[in-house]
Amino acid sequence: MNISIISIGKLKEKYLKQGIAEYLKRLSSYAKVEVIELPDEKAPENLSAAEMLIVKEKEGIRILDKISDDTHVIALAIEGKQKSSEEFAVSIDRLATYGKSKITFVIGGSLGLSSEVMKRSNESLSFSKMTLPHQLMRLVLLEQVYRAFRINRGEPYHK
């Protein structure tokens, strides 16, 4: 399986980089995983609603440019469907069973994802009703993908 994670914003925190590197290493025996980091749109602090929309649209264009036509796209969004780790594992397994060998997860910037990215997405996933830093979501997502592979193979880890 080929998994891409497209994320807006440069990761600066060393501890997050280390955690991400660890899970990429662990995942290497299950799937080919690629993390694509795209620059965020520079914007002043107090944006109007129209300015926020423009920022999301510009970031959305960058994201859509990196998504291939043959991939199953899962957008990470606070309004997405919440799943348990086991339900998420079943979703990953079903995609593989039905011939979806490419999955792309999309993590937006601090303002979220554009409507065009949401339209392109096959599904929307939420890890919490709480707002989480988009940089932290990379690590959380990789851990859950790793956990899903372990669950699907009946390997210990997820308890």
UniProtKB/Swiss-Prot annotation:
EC number: 2.1.1.177
Record carries keyword Cytoplasm: yes
Superkingdom to which the source organism belongs: Bacteria
Example GO molecular function: rRNA (pseudouridine-N3-)-methyltransferase activity
UniProt main location, coarse: cytoplasm
Keyword hit for Zinc: no
Catalytic activity: pseudouridine(1915) in 23S rRNA + S-adenosyl-L-methionine = N(3)-methylpseudouridine(1915) in 23S rRNA + S-adenosyl-L-homocysteine + H(+)
Positions with a binding annotation for S-adenosyl-L-methionine: L76, G108, F127, S128, K129, M130, T131, L132
UniProtKB keywords: Cytoplasm, Methyltransferase, rRNA processing, S-adenosyl-L-methionine, Transferase
Coiled coil segments of this chain: none
Location(s) in or outside the cell: Cytoplasm
Main enzyme class: transferase
Gene Ontology CC: one annotated term: cytoplasm
SUPFAM superfamilies found in the cross-reference section: alpha/beta knot
Pfam families: SPOUT_MTase (PF02590)
UniProt record similarity statement: Belongs to the RNA methyltransferase RlmH family.
NCBIfam families xrefs: PRK00103.1-3, tRNA_RlmH_YbeA
Quaternary context: Homodimer.
Biological role stated in the UniProt entry: Specifically methylates the pseudouridine at position 1915 (m3Psi1915) in 23S rRNA.
Record's protein name: Ribosomal RNA large subunit methyltransferase H
Organism: Bacillus mycoides (strain KBAB4)
Taxonomic lineage of the native organism: Bacteria, Bacillati, Bacillota, Bacilli, Bacillales
